[in-house]
Design a protein with these regions (language model features):
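Single transmembrane alpha-helix segments in multi-pass membrane proteins
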Residues: 25-90, 115-120
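Transmembrane helix-bundle core of multi-pass membrane transporters
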Residues: 123-191
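Interfacial loop-to-helix junctions that mark the boundaries of transmembrane helices
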Residues: 7-14, 39-47, 90-96, 161-175
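Alpha-helical transmembrane segments within multi-pass membrane transporters and channels
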Residues: 91-131
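Hydrophobic alpha-helical transmembrane segments
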Residues: 15-20, 45, 53, 74-78, ...
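Transmembrane alpha-helical segments of polytopic membrane transport and secretion proteins
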Residues: 1-20, 28, 37
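Short cytoplasmic-facing helical segments at TM-TM junctions of multi-pass membrane proteins
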Residues: 193-203
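Structural signal for alpha-helical transmembrane segments and their membrane-water exit/capping regions
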Residues: 21-37, 65, 141-142, 185-194
Length: 203
């Protein structure tokens, strides 16, 4: 009886379900997608999702506490737009524009933490508010115009050579993603911060 329960709990665990869904989708598109398994398709897929996965590492800590952050996409967009405006219209050097991008997104994180921890606003409501706030600020600052960062070949394009450069056709961003995954996994499993987050979410 215990053995049957352990097998059932194994197959019903979230990790197994998530992995099974991923394998199913991969097999489905491999069978019915004409060019899905080509090298160009795989590289393009990795290049388009690695930064989203990096954002998901941070979201894992938030969800493990029993909370949620609805603003993460709009905050990333707002930071990128303000950084683009800083470089294109305010004529700041690219390193300053990147620092401004980080500071803007960090400020929204601090605001979310203040609203949730100090003002006792539910995470769903607080982050929904900052989501629209970030979206509005991004639209106002950029005037709903596309902001372009320097191309790889320009002197200011050094950061793209760091993050977008390929290693024998393999995107460097994916390598950074794997490194961040190892760091985040270690923090989540073996550090006080990770265990504290899980303890809060389990209570």
């Amino acid at each position: 009886m215990k053995k049957q329960k352990s097998i059932k709990s194994l197959f019903m665990s979230q990790r197994i379900i998530a992995l099974s869904c991923l394998i199913f989708l991969f097999l489905f598109f491999s069978c019915f997608g004409k060019n899905f398994l080509t090298q160009n398709s795989m590289v393009s897929l990795l290049e388009s999702v690695y930064y989203i996965i990096c954002l998901a590492f941070g979201m894992t800590f938030v969800i493990s506490t029993g909370g949620i952050d609805l603003s993460i996409g709009c905050v990333a967009m707002c930071g990128a737009l303000i950084g683009g405006v800083s470089y294109n219209q305010w004529h700041m050097p690219i390193w300053a524009a990147l620092i401004i991008t980080v500071l803007v997104t960090t400020a929204f994180g601090v605001l979310n933490g203040f609203l949730i921890s100090c003002c006792k606003i539910p995470p769903f409501v607080a982050t929904m508010g900052t989501q629209y706030l970030a979206q509005g600020i991004g639209y106002i600052v950029s005037r709903v115009q596309t902001m372009r960062y320097p191309v790889v070949t320009s002197p200011d394009g050094w950061f793209k050579r760091v993050f977008y450069k390929s290693l024998d056709g393999f995107p460097m961003g994916v390598i950074y993603m794997v490194i961040l995954f190892v760091i985040a996994s270690f923090m989540f499993r073996y550090t006080k911060i990770g265990k504290y987050a899980c303890a809060i979410g389990s209570n």
